[in-house]
C-alpha cells in the first residue's frame, strides 16, 4: 500500500481530503504560514548571493577602502581583477595511466 492511498482517496469528483474540519481557523492559519514559508524559501534559494552580499556590505559594492592610500587601493583592484581573469591559452592536461 502506498503512502498516497493512506492519506488521500481518489473519488469520482477528484481528490477528497479526509480532514473533517478544514474550515478551522488554526488549519487555515497553518496553511497560510506554510505557503509563505515555501515562497520565502524559494526566493532565498534563487537570490541568496544578492541578499547576503547586500546584508554583508550594505549598499556598497565591496569592503570599505576608506583611509587606505590610493596605491594600495589600485594594488587591491589589480589583485581582484587578476583573480577573476582567466587565461584561455593555458590548460593543464592530466593523462591517466
From Swiss-Prot:
InterPro entries: Flu_M2. Cytoplasmic tail plays an important role in virion assembly and morphogenesis. The keyword Chloroplast does not apply. The chain crosses the membrane at residues 23-43. Belongs to the influenza viruses matrix protein M2 family. Homotetramer; composed of two disulfide-linked dimers held together by non-covalent interactions. May interact with matrix protein 1. The keyword Cytoplasm does not apply. GO terms for biological process: protein complex oligomerization; symbiont genome entry into host cell via pore formation in plasma membrane; symbiont-mediated suppression of host autophagy. Forms a proton-selective ion channel that is necessary for the efficient release of the viral genome during virus entry. After attaching to the cell surface, the virion enters the cell by endocytosis. Acidification of the endosome triggers M2 ion channel activity. It is a single-pass type III membrane protein. Keywords: Disulfide bond, Host cell membrane, Host membrane, Host-virus interaction, Hydrogen ion transport, Inhibition of host autophagy by virus, Ion channel, Ion transport, Lipoprotein, Membrane, Palmitate, Phosphoprotein, Signal-anchor, Transmembrane, Transmembrane helix, Transport, Viral ion channel, Virion. Residues 61-80 are annotated as: Disordered. This is Matrix protein 2. When the channel is activated, one or more imidazole moieties of His-37 probably become bi-protonated. It holds the Pfam family Flu_M2. Coiled coil: none annotated. The lineage of its organism: Viruses, Riboviria, Orthornavirae, Negarnaviricota, Polyploviricotina. GO terms for molecular function: monoatomic ion channel activity; proton transmembrane transporter activity. The record marks 41 as: Seems to be involved in pH gating. Its main location: virion. Residues 1-22 are virion surface.
Amino acid at each position: 500500500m502506498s503512502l498516497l492511498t493512506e492519506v488521500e482517496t481518489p473519488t469520482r469528483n477528484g481528490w477528497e481530503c479526509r480532514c473533517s474540519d478544514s474550515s478551522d481557523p488554526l488549519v487555515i492559519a497553518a496553511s497560510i504560514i506554510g505557503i509563505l514559508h515555501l515562497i520565502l524559501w524559494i526566493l532565498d534559494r534563487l537570490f541568496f548571493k544578492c541578499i547576503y552580499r547586500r546584508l554583508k556590505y550594505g549598499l556598497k559594492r565591496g569592503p570599505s577602502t576608506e583611509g587606505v592610500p590610493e596605491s594600495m587601493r589600485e594594488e587591491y583592484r589589480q589583485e581582484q581583477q587578476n583573480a577573476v581573469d582567466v587565461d584561455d591559452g593555458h590548460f593543464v592536461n592530466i593523462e591517466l595511466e
